[in-house]
Amino acid sequence: MRKFSVLMITALLLSGCSTGEQPPIAAPGVIPSCDQIDISKETSEVLKMSCLDGSSEINYHSIKGPIIINVWASWCTGCKEEMPYFVDLYANPIFKSGEIKLLGIDVDEKNADSGPNFIKSNGMSWPHLEDTDSRSKLVFGPGVPVTYFLDKSGEVIHKHIGAYRSKSQLYEAVEKYFEVKL
């Protein structure tokens, strides 16, 4: 974890500034673009993943916060159970304004269409990356779901292993770790 923090700090020191402009939210049934995710301009190629809309690649270590990163898979029972809570959370004005961002990472799919179909059928209108070769396990570990909260400096301020069991549990974590009122 210390090595991860050092990498994140290094990436942030090398980062540029965001314009603060937010692209429009994707319509239901559309795979959203990853353009709204703030990233550093210079970073190593340690963990590069493709955006599920096919528009770009993003190196995980270049992602800036504040952001919630939810690692999921379409076949995962816990992921299916908690996804409505994330859909509801993303509708909150704090996320719509870009004050806090949400990023999904789809892992361990057997079929290339599974992740995009899951996103569309569940109304997941935030950006998603796909890990097609399981390299994300080096950072996030082997199990799903797992959710990370990163602060403005890119530091992990909270890690939740397993599914959120209620909307209130997820909301309470967001309010506590990002010091916001939803």
What would you call each of these model-derived segments?
Residues 117-124, 130-182:
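Thiol/disulfide oxidoreductase modules built on the thioredoxin-like
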Residues 1-50, 172, 182:
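N-terminal targeting signals for export/organelle localization
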Residues 65-67, 72-75, 143:
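Short pre-active-site segment immediately N-terminal to redox-active cysteine/selenocysteine motifs
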Residues 80-122, 132-138:
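Structural microenvironment flanking redox-active thiols in thiol-disulfide oxidoreductases
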Residues 42-44, 63-64, 97-100, 142:
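Extracytoplasmic
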Residues 68-69, 102, 147:
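Hydrophobic beta-strand anchors of alpha/beta hydrolase catalytic cores
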Residues 46-67:
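A short beta-strand-turn-helix
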Residues 71-73, 105-108, 131-133, 160-162:
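Active-site-proximal beta-strand/loop segments in catalytic clefts of secreted hydrolases
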